[in-house]
Amino acid sequence: MNYFELFKFSPAFDIDTAVLAERYRELQRAVHPDKFANDTEQQRLLSVQRTAQVNDGYQTLKDPIRRAEHMLSLRGIDLSHETTTVKDTAFLMQQMEWREALEDIRDSADPQECIDELYDSFAAYRTKLTKLLTAQLSSDSEEDALLAAVQVRKLKFMAKLHDELTRIEDALLD
């Protein structure tokens, strides 16, 4: 299913999430199972299925990584169950630096400063990746689509690192 069509968007990485939320509410009202409570069993089942599609579409389009994955899947590149690793040497070196920094937080004289620096570093790198991804996804080139898949893989890794940093910060606050 093309969630961009469902929510009446042109396929694009940058979408207005406020408009997305508004269209989500409109679709929810139109297909909500309560609206079909007195209809046939088949109509009620279709309503439940349609509601699930609307919910999944909304969750997909509101999350930038899932949105990018969806755009790529519409172009025949499925990353949803993929285990391919990034082979970019510079990125691998950066990963190692971040991992070392994560390990060093607890022994640091000022753990919060280290955490803040890592959050800033992650944000800067995500911004860089997002700019590349936006340009690559707006292109019709197969090569750019494959490069966009690489950026998505990197962003997925960044999301995991961010979650790990958040867990470390939470543990230090306990």
UniProtKB/Swiss-Prot annotation:
List the Gene3D superfamilies: DnaJ domain, HscB, C-terminal domain
- Domain J residue range list: 2-74
Q: What are the entry keywords?
A: Chaperone
Coiled-coil segments on the chain, per record: none
> Could you state one GO biological process linked to this protein?
protein folding
Cite a single Pfam family from the UniProt record: HSCB_C
Self-association or partners: how does it assemble? Interacts with HscA and stimulates its ATPase activity.
Q: What does this protein do?
A: Co-chaperone involved in the maturation of iron-sulfur cluster-containing proteins. Seems to help targeting proteins to be folded toward HscA.
Q: What is this protein called?
A: Co-chaperone protein HscB homolog
The species this protein was found in: Shewanella sp. (strain MR-7)
